C-alpha cells in the first residue's frame, strides 16, 4: 500500500488550517519597593482597584493604591520572601473567601484557611469579600427578637435579628463575655454564629474556642481569627471575611449572628496600612475613609424581606474605649453607624455589678419592636427605676432622714441591681427572665433581704423547673404574660419554702 504525496500534503494543510495558537497574555509588573506588609510595583497599568495579584513566590496581594507610575499592594501573607525586582502578575480576580456549612465548627484565618489542625475544609463555594449591602427594598424592619440570655440586655436594651448593636467599653470590662454568653444562648434557636477575633492574643482565642466547645456552641459557630502576630492586612480583612461567610447563610434564608471583637484594632491596622501607602492622615492620624471602612461592613447586616428569603444577619461590633472616652473618633463613628450601643462601665465592673451595663447610656434604637410582649410589660419601668435609684443613691449618702417613698425607691433599686447581676456563661431562657423580673417589678422581692436576692433567684429557677413547668411553657409559646394570679401563686408558693439568711 503506497501513500501518495498529495494525501500527506492535504492532511498537513488541514492540520495547519485547524491549528489555533493559545497564547496566554497576562499583565506582569516588577516590585520596586517592599516592606511592612506593603509592596509597590511598576508595570501593572491595567490592574483594577481591589484586584488580587500574585508574587513570584506564590504569595497573594491586593491592589489598593492605583498611582500614576506604580501600584500600592497590601501583601496577604509573609512578605519577608519578596524582594525588589521580583515579578508580580495580575490574576483578573477580586478577593474571595470560601463559604458554606463546611466551615461551621472550624477555626479559620481571614483567607478561609483552617488554623485548628483538623484538616482541610471541603468546600468549593466562594463569595467576593467586598459585596454591596442589601438595598432598601430588599430589607424588612427588625421584628424578631435575638435573645442574648442576659437579663440586663434582654430587658433594657433588647436586640432584634438584623440589628447592629455596638458593645463599647474599656478593656477588661467583660465585652467578650457578653458576646460569648449570647452565642451560647443560641443553642436551640437555629442560629449560625460567627466570632471574628481581630488582633487578639492567640491564647485568648484558644480560650474562646474551648469555652464554646465546652458549652456545645462550637457546633453552630465559625471562628475567624487574625491574631496580634499576623500582618496588618489580615487584621484589616478579618471582619469582611466574617460577614461574607455569614451572608452565604443569610441569602439562603437562615439567621446569622456575627461578633467583631474588636473594630478598634481593625481601624488601627487600616491606619497603619494607609500611612504606609502614603495616604494623607486626618483626625487622630486615621485616613479620611475610616468611616466608610466600618459603614460598608456594618451596612451588610440586615433583616431581608420575605421575597429575598427572610434571612437575617445581626452584627455585634466591639469598640474599646480609653478611660471611658466615648467621644473619641472611632467610638463616635461606630455609634453613629449602629442601631444602638451597650456601654460597659469599668466602675460598675469593679464594684461587682456584672455584666457592667450602664443603663443610662445604653440604648437600643430598633430592638423595642422585636421584644416579646411579656418582656416589654415586665421591663417597662426598669430603666426609670434604675435611673432614679442611681440619682437617689448619691443623695442618700449625705443624710439618713429619708421619707418612706424615697426609702422604698432605694430598697427597690438595690434589689433591681442585684437581680440584673448574672454569672459568667450562665445565660437564662427568656421565660425565666420574665418571671423573676415580674417578681421584682411587682414588689414580691421587697421583703427579701438584698444579700439573699441572688440565692433566691437561683433556687426559684430550680423550683420553677420542677413545680411550674406549665407556666414556663405558656410564656415560651404565647410570648405573653400569664394571669397575675398564676404568677402570684408561683412566686408566693416558692417564698413559703425559701429560708432567708439571718
Curated annotation (Swiss-Prot):
Cellular-component GO terms for this entry: plasma membrane; proton-transporting ATP synthase complex
Residues noted as binding ATP in the record, renumbered to the chain: 169-176
Gene Ontology molecular function terms on file: ADP binding; ATP binding; proton-transporting ATP synthase activity, rotational mechanism
Domain of life: Bacteria
Membrane topology, as annotated: Peripheral membrane protein
Disordered: annotated segments: 115-135
Sites annotated Required for activity: 362
Catalytic activity, as annotated: ATP + H2O + 4 H(+)(in) = ADP + phosphate + 5 H(+)(out)
Entry's localization field: Cell membrane
EC number: 7.1.2.2
Protein's UniProt keywords contain Transport: yes
Subunit structure of this chain's protein: F-type ATPases have 2 components, CF(1) - the catalytic core - and CF(0) - the membrane proton channel. CF(1) has five subunits: alpha(3), beta(3), gamma(1), delta(1), epsilon(1). CF(0) has three main subunits: a(1), b(2) and c(9-12). The alpha and beta chains form an alternating ring which encloses part of the gamma chain. CF(1) is attached to CF(0) by a central stalk formed by the gamma and epsilon chains, while a peripheral stalk is formed by the delta and b chains.
Protein name from the UniProt record: ATP synthase subunit alpha
Organism: Bacillus cereus (strain G9842)
Upper taxonomic lineage: Bacteria, Bacillati, Bacillota, Bacilli, Bacillales
Amino acid at each position: 500500500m503506497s501513500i501518495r504525496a498529495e494525501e500527506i500534503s492535504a492532511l498537513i494543510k488541514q492540520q495547519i488550517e485547524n491549528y489555533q495558537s493559545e497564547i496566554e497574555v497576562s499583565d506582569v509588573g516588577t516590585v520596586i519597593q517592599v516592606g511592612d506588609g506593603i509592596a509597590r510595583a511598576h508595570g501593572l497599568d491595567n490592574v483594577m482597584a481591589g484586584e488580587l495579584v500574585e508574587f513570584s513566590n506564590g504569595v497573594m496581594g491586593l491592589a489598593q493604591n492605583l498611582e500614576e507610575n506604580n501600584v500600592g499592594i497590601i501583601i496577604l501573607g509573609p512578605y519577608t520572601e519578596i524582594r525588589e525586582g521580583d515579578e508580580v502578575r495580575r490574576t483578573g480576580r477580586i478577593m474571595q473567601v470560601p463559604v458554606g456549612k463546611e466551615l461551621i465548627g472550624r477555626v479559620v484565618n481571614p483567607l478561609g484557611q483552617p488554623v485548628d489542625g483538623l484538616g482541610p475544609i471541603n468546600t468549593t463555594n466562594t463569595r467576593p469579600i467586598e459585596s454591596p449591602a442589601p438595598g432598601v427594598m430588599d430589607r424588612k424592619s427588625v421584628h424578631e427578637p435575638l435573645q442574648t440570655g442576659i437579663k440586663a440586655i434582654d430587658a433594657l436594651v433588647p436586640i432584634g435579628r438584623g440589628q447592629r448593636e455596638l458593645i463599647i467599653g474599656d478593656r477588661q470590662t467583660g465585652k467578650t463575655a457578653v458576646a460569648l454568653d449570647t452565642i451560647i444562648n443560641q443553642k436551640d434557636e437555629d442560629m449560625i454564629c460567627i466570632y471574628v477575633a481581630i488582633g487578639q492574643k492567640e491564647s485568648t482565642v484558644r480560650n474562646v474556642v474551648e469555652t464554646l466547645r465546652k458549652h456545645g456552641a462550637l457546633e453552630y459557630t465559625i471562628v475567624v481569627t487574625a491574631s496580634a502576630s499576623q500582618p496588618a492586612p489580615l487584621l484589616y480583612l478579618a471582619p469582611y471575611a466574617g460577614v461574607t461567610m455569614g451572608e452565604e447563610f443569610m441569602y439562603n434564608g437562615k439567621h446569622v449572628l456575627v461578633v467583631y471583637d474588636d473594630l478598634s484594632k481593625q481601624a488601627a491596622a487600616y491606619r497603619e496600612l494607609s500611612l504606609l501607602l502614603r495616604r494623607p492622615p486626618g483626625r487622630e492620624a486615621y485616613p479620611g475613609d475610616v468611616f466608610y471602612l466600618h459603614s460598608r461592613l456594618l451596612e451588610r447586616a440586615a433583616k431581608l424581606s420575605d421575597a429575598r428569603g427572610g434571612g437575617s444577619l445581626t452584627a455585634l461590633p466591639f469598640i474599646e474605649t480609653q478611660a471611658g472616652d466615648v467621644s473619641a473618633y472611632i467610638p463616635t463613628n461606630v455609634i453613629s453607624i449602629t442601631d444602638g450601643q451597650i456601654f460597659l462601665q469599668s466602675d460598675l465592673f469593679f464594684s461587682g455589678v456584672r455584666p457592667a451595663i450602664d443603663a443610662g447610656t445604653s440604648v437600643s434604637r430598633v430592638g423595642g419592636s422585636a421584644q416579646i410582649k411579656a418582656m416589654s410589660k415586665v421591663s417597662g419601668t426598669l430603666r426609670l427605676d434604675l435611673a432614679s435609684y442611681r440619682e437617689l443613691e448619691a443623695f442618700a449618702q449625705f443624710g439618713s432622714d429619708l421619707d418612706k417613698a424615697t426609702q422604698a425607691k432605694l430598697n427597690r433599686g438595690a434589689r433591681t441591681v442585684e437581680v440584673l447581676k448574672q454569672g459568667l456563661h450562665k445565660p437564662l431562657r427568656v421565660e425565666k427572665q420574665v418571671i423573676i423580673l415580674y417578681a421584682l417589678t411587682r414588689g414580691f422581692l421587697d421583703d427579701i433581704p438584698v444579700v439573699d436576692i441572688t440565692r433566691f433567684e437561683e433556687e426559684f429557677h430550680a423550683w420553677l423547673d420542677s413545680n411550674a413547668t406549665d407556666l414556663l411553657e405558656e410564656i415560651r409559646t404565647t410570648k405573653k404574660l400569664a394571669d397575675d394570679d398564676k404568677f402570684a401563686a408561683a412566686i408566693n408558693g416558692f417564698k413559703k419554702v425559701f429560708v432567708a439568711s439571718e
